[in-house]
Amino acid sequence: MERTLIIVKPDAVQRGLVGEVLRRLEQRGLRFVGLKLMKVDREVAERHYAEHRGKPFYEDLLAFITSGPVVVGVVEGPRAIEITRKTMGKTDPAQAEPGTIRGDLALTIGQNVIHGSDSPEKASYEIGLFFREDELVSYERAIDRWIMG
């Protein structure tokens, strides 16, 4: 079973969109196995965005993700990364398809509602940044046998 990390960013928390974002992921058949409201400190933000260090927008990324509370979650399911990425839509909401989270809810490329890991390696790394293993809960929903076989 594949797992991936999602972050409902400060803009979405401030706009009251957390429930809508989580609902859309659950409706795609994904199961939340970890979920928490938190403030990201600068050290974690730097580790999370390490690949962007040195880029012109790096400091803005850090300032934004540490500017207010976020909701961090781990979802699992077959092809969880692919399904999450398609449900999110393109990074730039102006290019995201209607019906995607970003296409419907995001305002700008800098305030685009949600982050999702883009590979199994990144998912594993990012999950480890935000969750201890004992914070992840495996369980079966009644509907899982219909979705996951």
Swiss-Prot record:
InterPro entries referenced in this protein's UniProt entry, alphabetically: NDK-like_dom, NDK-like_dom_sf, Nucleoside_diP_kinase, Nucleoside_diP_kinase_AS
An example Gene Ontology biological process: GTP biosynthetic process
CDD domains, per the entry: NDPk_I (cd04413)
UniProt keyword Phosphoprotein, yes or no: yes
UniProt-listed SMART domains: NDK
Reactions that this protein is recorded to catalyse: a 2'-deoxyribonucleoside 5'-diphosphate + ATP = a 2'-deoxyribonucleoside 5'-triphosphate + ADP; a ribonucleoside 5'-diphosphate + ATP = a ribonucleoside 5'-triphosphate + ADP
Residues annotated as catalytic: 115 (pros-phosphohistidine intermediate)
Compartments (UniProt record): Cytoplasm
Kinase listed as a keyword: yes
Family (UniProt): Belongs to the NDK family.
Function: Major role in the synthesis of nucleoside triphosphates other than ATP. The ATP gamma phosphate is transferred to the NDP beta phosphate via a ping-pong mechanism, using a phosphorylated active-site intermediate.
Protein name, entry field: Nucleoside diphosphate kinase
Organism: Thermomicrobium roseum (strain ATCC 27502 / DSM 5159 / P-2)
